Amino acid sequence: MIKNYGDRYHLIDKKALEDKKLDKDQLVEFVRTSGISDIGKNYNIVSIIGSQSTGKSTLLNQLFGTKFDVQNRQQSVGQTTVGIWLSKDVQNNVVVLDVEGSDSVERKSGENMVENQTALMALAMSHCFIINVFLNALGQHTSCQLSIIKIIMQQNLKLFQQDTVKHIIFVVRDWDEDANYEEASRRLNGYLLNIWNEIPKPDHYKETDFHQLFSVQVVTLVYYKMKKEFIEQTNDLHAKLSNQQDPNFIFKDFDYEKNVRWSDMPQYLSNIWEVISNNKDLNLPNEKILISNMRCQQIKLEALDGVKQLNEDLQNRVRTKLVDNFAQECQTIMNLAFKLYDKDARDYHIEVYKEKEKELKDELVNRFYTYFQKQTEQLKQHYMNTLTENLETLKRESIYNLPDKLNELDLFKLQFEEQLAKSVIQKGLWQEEDHIRYFRQQFDNQLKAFVEAQLATFKQQLDNIIKSECDKIVSSQVLNISSKFWQQIESDYYAMISEKYQKYEVLLTGLRVQQKQIEDYLNKFEEDSFHNLKQVIAVASGRFKDQLFQQFKAQFVRAPDGQPRNWQKLTEEEIFHCYTDARDKVFQLLDSLRIRKIKFIRQQVVLKKKAQTLIISSSQKVQYQISSDADSDDVVLNDVFYTQVKMQLAEDIDVQYQDAIQKHKQDFLQNIPKPFWFLLLFFMYDDVLRWMGNPLFLYPILIILCFVGFCIAIGLHSLPKLAFQWVFRTLNQAVIPIIFGGISKLKGS
């Protein structure tokens, strides 16, 4: 069965009525080949209904230049139009529907529902209805098609209330000059009003004026054989329906945006006819929204496909490197997608258009977000690598330059934020603040680790410096031990450590160390510094004996003017006086070092802790030992060490004294001839042997040897030596002068 005649199309035919669906493929072909698809949404649809064989098709052909089949009046009367035919005004954007006539003698009994379905289809499609009636039939209810309108109103009130206002034009045919126009208009409007009042309505529409849903006009046409008048009247009616410049144009306020584009009309009409033919409730806005959804979804996918290559290119680049102007490229892709979408989708339902546009944006944004995450990783990696390189360079810098350098490194965080801001298409869209916060934390952690490592290295260097300074302080006092030994060490230590403390505190603050950590660092600095001082003093205490001995020699061997003493010119009493005076001074200095302790205490001064030495005198010794922080390691010279030092010092001092005495007597002994000593040994050797055999001589010798061995065994090596020195010193002072004095007298006599 032929449906497509090129200039007209059989939209609803017997097959469509039987199958309850349209042949959408043929309709698509007709829309394409007839040029109707080119008019887009800027069109109006006009339908004509009326009794059969009343010249409806003829009237349409006269009005719009269409070529609907018309009845040959010389043949038998019958139905020409079956279902609904569709065509287009040859000059204007008006689509015309020729609807099957009512009161068909060919229609079988019980097919009124089919008539209603075709009328409802026309109503669903049309913006304006031309109801074709004859003047002599105004009193016939059926002839005026009012019964169909009643059924449509009664069953499909939602159709009117949801869509645009429908225009109804009653075309009264075969009008003559004797007819009363006002009476005809009143009667036709009265019929419609009666129908409106009779049909059931929702509560909120019970008081609604009929004219809020329908715009009704009555137009009269003379008998068609009065060609001149008939043509003039049909031209006027055509102008009302198609000429937007005509003052009586009935579609002046029409919203063309609500129209379905003719390219989508096949699907739209198929959906409508399926609903109508199955006697379902028809909801035109929903059908339009459905079509808009389908087309806008398709256009959205086409727009995404149109920017697919750009998306893939951006994705590939961001995987391998940092992309400059990332956000600008994303925006360019999005703008292009919107342009492609808007070009084909802007004529569809505005809400659907916006919804799909938002979906398009969301899909692109979601894709861009995956790229953004990779871009952010690249950005973080770039600045973290830059930070690492700069920190490697800073390792060679002085730590005192680090505070200023850290301020310079902070610029990297600002640069990261600026670059990240250039990578987002909308502030706050991709939670960039979280990325900034995480990067700052990662950046600060690496910076903190670097600072801690540098501080650890610096602390070792500082400890070495403190130890060296302490060694200088203590050594300067050890080289000249005085009664102010401890006071001077304390004073010099404080002067040195205070300067270092202040610099260290300023450095820690500049390196952004937290206040609690600063206190910990300073406490550790105080304790370690003081520990270094204690170690230096402990090591220096090993030189106390030698230094005191040197100071003894300086006082004993040299006169007050600094010149060496001439022992031969001094008497033994004078030598002994010099000896005891120098010895007592040295022992007094040694005694001042004997039980001194170094103790670490803190004093809260302007919220700063300081280390200081506490010199505890002999009277405080017991009190200190029972204190809670007493430590035996704090003692500089304990009792055993003190005894050893004093004995060794006394031994060395006595040797000096004996040496002085020997030098004093050196003249006298040198005057005795050497042969005399050989003769004395020769004549006395047998007496020596005899003495050795005498128990009174042997036993004392054995006792002395046992005493010496015992002292050596218990570690008192110097005790026998001191005893022998004392014995020989006594003999030297008492016996020898007597012997040599007698010899001198004999020589003198």
Swiss-Prot record:
GTP binds at G50, S51, Q52, S53, T54, G55, K56, S57. Probable GTP-binding protein that may be involved in cell development. It is an enzyme of class 3 (hydrolase). GO terms for biological process: endoplasmic reticulum membrane fusion. Keywords: Coiled coil, Endoplasmic reticulum, GTP-binding, Hydrolase, Membrane, Nucleotide-binding, Transmembrane, Transmembrane helix. Residues 445-465 form a coiled coil. HAMAP family: Sey1. Residues 693-695 are lumenal. This is Protein SEY1 homolog 2. Residues 1-671, 717-749 are cytoplasmic. It holds the Pfam family RHD3_GTPase. It is found in: Endoplasmic reticulum membrane. Belongs to the TRAFAC class dynamin-like GTPase superfamily. GB1/RHD3 GTPase family. RHD3 subfamily. Its main location: endoplasmic reticulum. It comes from the Eukaryota. Residues 40-265 form the GB1/RHD3-type G domain.
